[in-house]
């Protein structure tokens, strides 16, 4: 009789690298970084498609006859905007004659503003002020600030008011022989005309609600005339100019009083109108002005102030041959938490010179999607926690941290072989091992608990000579995940507080934030090293367990035909058990040799591999099996006589 020894043989050669883990080691033909570095995409995006709203003009207006060629956004995104061709928030606030007057209102946790160009130097609006840019800057800044603290906002286009009987609506030749809707100009008709008339006393009320919109705070334009000297105003002997707003307690909240404040001292015969932006609570207010003229607030924007939210402002400029201003840009840059989207090239439209710019379409294409992170540097929707460069604030969501590629730990991949147990098998994963993305995508401080690494390793596996059990390793992963969740919450709260404080001239806070993020990145990289070691050990143990199951199945199939002389080795009488018999024992004839273990079902190919040492005779088994987060893909047999 000829007896042969058949063993499951270690099949590692120089193409394999060794990976050490907690509780077990692995040989692998390949390795990969746990995460790749991601690069943010330039432009705007949102964290949640259901909780954002946009405010725009013709470039986001679906009702424009040239849509979609006239638009800088997709049809999907246009549906999210409150827009009208020719409109702007400021035009609706002041209502200059001959301009579009649109009722802007809506609700959203994230507000995207792409408007403003329709009130720019090209519009040539006068009405006692040839250059409105500084007022526009102040207006936009207040809009962004209040919008970031509110869920809903609405134009209030008709305030309740009481006007003195002696005042009647006035007009101005430099305002298309009309005047703004807000403020309204009232004048006194005095007989004889050389007399001054009486002081004006008027009242207006800011409501607590406008339609369905709650109003906790109003943005009001407090407008008044600026005279260069008393003589310019006092041609009729009417003393000093004043226009002052008082709250219900008699406190001054806005306006100008040349009875106590000096005139400009410039030379000129025509006054200029100035409008300051006031944030006022609902209530009744009074306006007192010197004889002859009264500028009366008639409109406001109301905000519910119910929750902090996100604000994105998009640069709004004309194409060639039209003069633009950059008030939107400056307003956003000076408002904490405002994200600004800017073009790098001149505006070049498709429908005409001013509508349908390709660069702007690309910058706004991200509004069609949900991002994991939005920032001044761009948006990210990949799951990696690392990026090559520091993302500039403000930033919101689960934002990646800056890291060097070589600092990211590597995990084994390709064909995997444990270094102990019943010796060997190999696996070729068809999907990502474990849910690492879900486990550590928080991008925050992580730390080792007082118990150290041992706090995660709760058990041992006696039959494999030590190490951790699969169950204890899973508990370890759960503990790491819980620790990370806790740290994620506390750290993100701290970062949000810093976001609230950051403005573009607060370099010290920027530096502090950068230091904190660097510390977060280093801590996360350290924790990933721990997870990598646990992962290697867990896979190694799982592979060893699968080998025990495989060896047990072979022994059971062999019955009395083969004698197991050591784990993974059998003696067979070649005269009693010929080749077909051996094929039955070791090749399984396409049947499943290992019980399935949920949850991962993977189609695998178990076969010999030219990388391996040992006999050229190999087992070929093709069967669907499931082994937690791993799959077997090859073993070989060593024959000895």
Curated annotation (Swiss-Prot):
It is a single-pass type I membrane protein. Residues 638-641 are cytoplasmic. The keyword Disulfide bond applies. It comes from the Viruses. Its main location: virion. GO terms for cellular component: host cell plasma membrane; membrane; viral envelope; virion membrane. Pfam families: Hema_esterase, Hema_HEFG, Hema_stalk. InterPro entries: Capsid_hemagglutn, Hemagglutn-estrase_core, Hemagglutn-estrase_hemagglutn, Hemagglutn_stalk_influenz-C. GO terms for molecular function: host cell surface receptor binding; sialate 4-O-acetylesterase activity; sialate 9-O-acetylesterase activity. The active site is at 58 (nucleophile), 352 (charge relay system), 355 (charge relay system). It catalyses: N-acetyl-9-O-acetylneuraminate + H2O = N-acetylneuraminate + acetate + H(+); N-acetyl-4-O-acetylneuraminate + H2O = N-acetylneuraminate + acetate + H(+). Residues 1 form the signal peptide. Its EC number is 3.1.1.53. The chain crosses the membrane at residues 617-637. One of its GO terms (biological process) is fusion of virus membrane with host plasma membrane. It is found in: Virion membrane; Host cell membrane. Glycans are attached at residues 13, 48, 131, 381. In natural infection, inactive HEF is matured into HEF1 and HEF2 outside the cell by one or more trypsin-like, arginine-specific endoprotease. Binds to the N-acetyl-9-O-acetylneuraminic acid residues on the cell surface, bringing about the attachment of the virus particle to the cell. Plays a major role in the determination of host range restriction and virulence. Class I viral fusion protein. Responsible for penetration of the virus into the cell cytoplasm by mediating the fusion of the membrane of the endocytosed virus particle with the endosomal membrane. Low pH in endosomes induce an irreversible conformational change in HEF2, releasing the fusion hydrophobic peptide. Several trimers are required to form a competent fusion pore. Homotrimer of disulfide-linked HEF1-HEF2. This is Hemagglutinin-esterase-fusion glycoprotein. It comes from Influenza C virus (strain C/Mississippi/1980). The gene is HE.
């Amino acid at each position: 009789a000829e007896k042969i020894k058949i063993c499951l043989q270690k099949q590692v050669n120089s193409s394999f690298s060794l990976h050490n883990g907690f509780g077990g080691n692995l040989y692998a033909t390949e390795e990969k970084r746990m995460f790749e570095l991601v690069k943010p995409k330039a432009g705007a995006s949102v964290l949640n498609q259901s909780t954002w709203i946009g405010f725009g003009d013709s470039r986001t207006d679906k009702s424009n006859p040239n849509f979609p060629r006239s638009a800088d956004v997709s049809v999907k995104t246009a549906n999210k905007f409150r827009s009208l061709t020719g409109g702007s928030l400021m035009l609706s606030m002041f209502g200059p004659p001959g301009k579009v007057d649109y009722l802007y209102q809506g609700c959203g946790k994230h507000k995207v503003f792409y408007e403003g160009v329709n009130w720019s130097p090209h519009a040539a609006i006068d009405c006692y002020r040839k250059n409105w840019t500084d007022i526009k800057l102040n207006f936009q800044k207040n809009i962004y600030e209040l919008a970031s603290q509110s869920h809903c906002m609405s134009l209030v286009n008709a305030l309740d008011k009481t006007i003195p009987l002696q005042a009647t609506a006035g007009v101005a030749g430099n305002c298309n022989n009309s005047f703004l809707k807000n403020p309204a100009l009232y004048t006194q008709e005095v007989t004889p005309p050389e007399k001054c008339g009486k002081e004006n006393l008027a009242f207006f009320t800011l409501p607590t609600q406008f339609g369905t919109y709650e109003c906790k705070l109003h943005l009001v334009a407090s407008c008044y005339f600026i005279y260069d000297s008393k003589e310019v105003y006092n041609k009729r002997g009417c003393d000093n100019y004043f226009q002052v707003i008082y709250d219900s307690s008699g406190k001054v909240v806005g306006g100008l009083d040349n009875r106590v404040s000096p005139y400009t001292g410039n030379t000129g015969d025509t006054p200029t109108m100035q409008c300051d932006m006031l944030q006022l609570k609902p209530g009744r207010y009074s306006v007192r002005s010197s004889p002859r003229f009264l500028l009366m607030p008639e409109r406001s924007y109301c905000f519910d102030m119910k929750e902090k939210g996100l604000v994105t402002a998009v640069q709004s400029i004309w194409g060639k041959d039209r003069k633009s201003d950059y008030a939107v840009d400056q307003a956003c840059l000076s408002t904490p938490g405002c994200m600004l989207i800017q073009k790098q090239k001149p505006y070049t439209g498709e429908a005409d010179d001013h509508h349908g710019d390709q660069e702007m379409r690309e910058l706004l294409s991200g509004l069609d999607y949900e991002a994991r992170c939005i920032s001044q540097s761009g948006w990210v929707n990949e799951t990696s926690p690392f990026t090559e460069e520091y993302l500039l604030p403000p930033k919101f969501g689960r934002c990646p941290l800056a890291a060097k590629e070589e600092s990211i730990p590597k995990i084994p991949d390709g064909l995997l072989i444990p270094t102990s147990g019943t010796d060997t098998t190999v696996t070729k994963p068809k999907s990502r091992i474990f849910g690492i993305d879900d486990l550590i995508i928080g991008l925050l401080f992580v730390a080792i608990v007082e118990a150290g690494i041992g706090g995660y390793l709760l058990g041992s596996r006696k039959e494999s000579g030590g190490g951790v059990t699969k169950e204890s390793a899973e508990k370890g992963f759960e503990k790491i995940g819980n620790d990370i969740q806790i740290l994620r919450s506390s750290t993100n709260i701290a970062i949000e507080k810093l976001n609230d404080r950051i403005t573009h001239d607060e370099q010290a806070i920027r530096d502090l934030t950068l230091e904190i993020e660097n510390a977060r990145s280093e801590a996360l990289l350290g924790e990933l090293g721990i997870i990598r070691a646990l992962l290697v050990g867990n896979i190694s143990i799982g592979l060893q367990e699968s080998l025990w199951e495989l060896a047990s199945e072979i022994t059971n199939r062999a019955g009395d035909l083969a004698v197991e002389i050591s784990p993974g080795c059998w003696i067979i009488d070649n005269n009693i058990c010929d080749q077909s018999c051996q094929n039955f024992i070791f090749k399984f004839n396409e049947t499943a040799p290992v019980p399935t273990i949920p949850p991962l079902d993977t189609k695998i190919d178990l076969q010999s591999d030219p990388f391996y040492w040992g006999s050229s005779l190999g087992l070929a088994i093709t069967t669907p099996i499931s082994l937690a987060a791993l799959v077997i893909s090859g073993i070989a047999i060593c024959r000895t006589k």
